[in-house]
């Protein structure tokens, strides 16, 4: 679960980290009032969406008057911001952040993730702030410095100082950086985060460090013990189909193709999308119904898939281990009858009672094509989608 920039900065302030004074605003009037509370300009106004690249898309602007603030708010509030990280529809802008402008002398990067390779929280720091860290890692990896957090000792101040020295910081900047490092590490561990990022972490012309931007990602598996973080969830930033799927504990990710995919198991779902691509098709989604592929969940999965108007055929790929394929077939038949599916449905069943399940599908009299293998299923669904 991602947070907005203003929410991240509110947390930073609570943990004693330096961030510009600012207010999240939902109306042009609130934006003007926020500028008055902050004091004399210039100010920076920022669209609040869960996506990077806002500046290049016009969603961040330095302004010198309240008239400019109102104009920016009227331009973006209620609209959608399209960046290189969004799809063609963009993300809805329901709030803008108004904050004091900062005199920037240098931009740095500081962030942390859970590294699966080391099974540790790893901090990364770089002198290349203000740009995508993925680009830095690809083009100049030597400019990224790391600190691995030992789970037994937790973050240590010396690690922050080491990173500061590697970044070329001097004097009071070193102690400020170490304090920010320790604060971020505390937030990361106490709030069950999967990602924390300040990009850029800036050095001002007075040699002070300021958290100019903030990005936080909370581990969704830990939300049950993070009620405050859960309250910060903004459903407007999610694909409505993904939100609906989450309510049924379905793992759904919308894609740009025209072949809907329903699979039990994340690995099998990835393999299914690969083989659809191999045979010339384009998956419309990733959808893992999990081990409990009941009729109700299969029905809901069909509804979610078919809510995408680009879908012209559906591939159902089920491997029956503990789950019996004949019961899955009953669920698919019932779901197709209830939902009223009007596109071809190709089903591949393998495993426990697969033959009986395939026979039930063939005898159903519905527009369901029983495939003999995964390759056969991919070929048939691609052909059906092209014919549609």
Swiss-Prot record:
The keyword Ligase applies. Its cofactor is Mg(2+). Mg(2+) binds at residues 199, 213. The keyword Flavoprotein does not apply. Its EC number is 6.2.1.5. Residues 9-244 form the ATP-grasp domain. ATP binds at residues 46, 53-55, 99, 102, 107. Substrate binds at residues 264, 321-323. PROSITE patterns: ATP_GRASP (PS50975), SUCCINYL_COA_LIG_3 (PS01217). It catalyses: succinate + ATP + CoA = succinyl-CoA + ADP + phosphate; GTP + succinate + CoA = succinyl-CoA + GDP + phosphate. Pathway: Carbohydrate metabolism; tricarboxylic acid cycle; succinate from succinyl-CoA (ligase route): step 1/1. GO terms for biological process: succinyl-CoA metabolic process; tricarboxylic acid cycle. InterPro entries: ATP-grasp (IPR011761), ATP-grasp_succ-CoA_synth-type (IPR013650), ATP_grasp_subdomain_1 (IPR013815), Succ-CoA_synthase_bsu_CS (IPR017866), SUCC_ACL_C (IPR005811), Succ_CoA_ligase-like_bsu (IPR005809), Succinyl-CoA_synth-like (IPR016102). GO terms for molecular function: ATP binding; magnesium ion binding; succinate-CoA ligase (ADP-forming) activity; succinate-CoA ligase (GDP-forming) activity. Binds 1 Mg(2+) ion per subunit. Belongs to the succinate/malate CoA ligase beta subunit family. Heterotetramer of two alpha and two beta subunits. This is Succinate--CoA ligase [ADP-forming] subunit beta. The lineage of its organism: Bacteria, Pseudomonadati, Pseudomonadota, Gammaproteobacteria, Enterobacterales. The gene is sucC.
């Amino acid at each position: 679960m991602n947070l907005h920039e203003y929410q991240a900065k509110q947390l930073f302030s609570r943990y004693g980290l330096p961030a510009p004074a600012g207010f999240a605003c939902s109306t042009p009037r609130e934006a003007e009032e926020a500028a008055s509370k902050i004091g004399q300009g210039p100010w920076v106004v920022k669209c609040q969406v869960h996506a990077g690249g806002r500046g290049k898309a016009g969603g961040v602007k330095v302004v010198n008057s309240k008239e400019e603030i109102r104009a920016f708010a009227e331009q973006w509030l209620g609209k959608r911001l399209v960046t290189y990280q969004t799809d063609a529809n963009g993300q809805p802008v329901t709030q803008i952040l108004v904050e004091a402008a900062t005199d920037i002398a240098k931009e740095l990067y500081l962030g942390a993730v859970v590294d699966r390779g080391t099974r540790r929280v790893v901090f990364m720091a770089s002198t290349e702030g203000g740009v995508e860290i993925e680009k830095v890692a690809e083009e100049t990896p030597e400019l990224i410095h790391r600190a691995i957090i030992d789970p037994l000792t937790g973050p240590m101040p010396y690690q922050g100082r080491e990173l500061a020295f590697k970044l070329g910081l001097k004097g009071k900047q070193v102690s400020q950086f170490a304090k920010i490092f320790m604060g971020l590490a505390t937030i990361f561990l106490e709030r069950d985060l999967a990602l924390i990022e300040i990009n850029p972490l800036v050095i001002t012309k007075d040699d002070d460090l300021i958290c100019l931007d903030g990005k936080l990602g909370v581990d969704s598996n830990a939300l049950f013990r993070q009620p405050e973080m859960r309250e910060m969830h903004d459903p407007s930033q999610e694909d409505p189909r993904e939100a609906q799927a989450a309510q049924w504990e379905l793992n759904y990710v919308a894609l740009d193709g025209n072949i809907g995919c329903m699979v039990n198991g994340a690995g099998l779902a990835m393999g299914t999308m690969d083989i659809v691509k191999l045979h010339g098709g384009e998956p419309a989604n990733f959808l893992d119904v999990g081990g409990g592929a009941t009729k109700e969940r299969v029905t809901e999965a069909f509804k979610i898939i078919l809510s995408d108007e680009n879908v012209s055929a559906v591939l159902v790929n089920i491997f029956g281990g503990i789950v019996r394929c004949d019961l899955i077939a009953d669920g698919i038949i019932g779901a197709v009858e209830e939902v009223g599916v009007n596109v071809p449905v190709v089903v591949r069943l393998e495993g426990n009672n697969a033959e009986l399940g395939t026979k039930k599908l063939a005898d159903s009299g519905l527009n369901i094509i029983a495939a003999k293998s995964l390759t056969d299923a991919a070929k048939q669904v691609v052909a059906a989608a092209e014919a549609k």
